[in-house]
Amino acid sequence: FEASGGGVTVSGGEALMQMDSVGELFSRLKQRNVHTLIQTAGLFNYKVFENLVLPYTDTIYFDLKLMDSDAHKQYCGVPNHSIHENFRKVQALARDSVIEVLPRVPLVPFITDTDENLSAIADFMLENGVKNMQILPYNPIWLDKLPRFGSVQRLDFGEGTGKFMPDAELDRCTEIFESRGIHVHCHR
């Protein structure tokens, strides 16, 4: 760890549901000059975040899934208004070089990877001054983990459910952002 110059990433579930603990951990890490990164889906109390976690955070990986609030509620369980507002706030800090923010879009076939959704996300990125982002290709390995979490129900959202995303689909998704001048990083 020390030889590599690495840092500490806290992710979840939603790590920011434990802001007291994350803030304390990051505070101690910063005392040792360790780089800190939080991965979030964006559903958190910004005032608490601003006081407890932000002062000790170097980088935020901020996942955005769906722009339509009804679809977000259907698939994620909550509307996305506060998520978008939190993104605007942290991205404003990134524009002022207070913190590094990397927006990320997890691609789920026929849900988050539609042209309509990705175009809306791209427009939202432009409105917020984003020039670089990451897309996270769908990975079907999670399906085999469901029984370990007590779930016997296998979700099915079409023929893409059990397959890795083909390169042509990743190219299509990438082009939606890059055609608007947003650089996309994607691990294939």
How would you name each of these model-derived features?
Residues 123, 146-176:
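A structural motif corresponding to the C-terminal lobe/cap of the Radical SAM core domain
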Residues 27, 92, 127, 168, ...:
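Polar/charged alpha-helical tracts
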Residues 1-141, 147:
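Conserved AdoMet/S-adenosylmethionine-binding subsite of the radical SAM
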Residues 179-188:
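Radical SAM enzyme core and accessory elements
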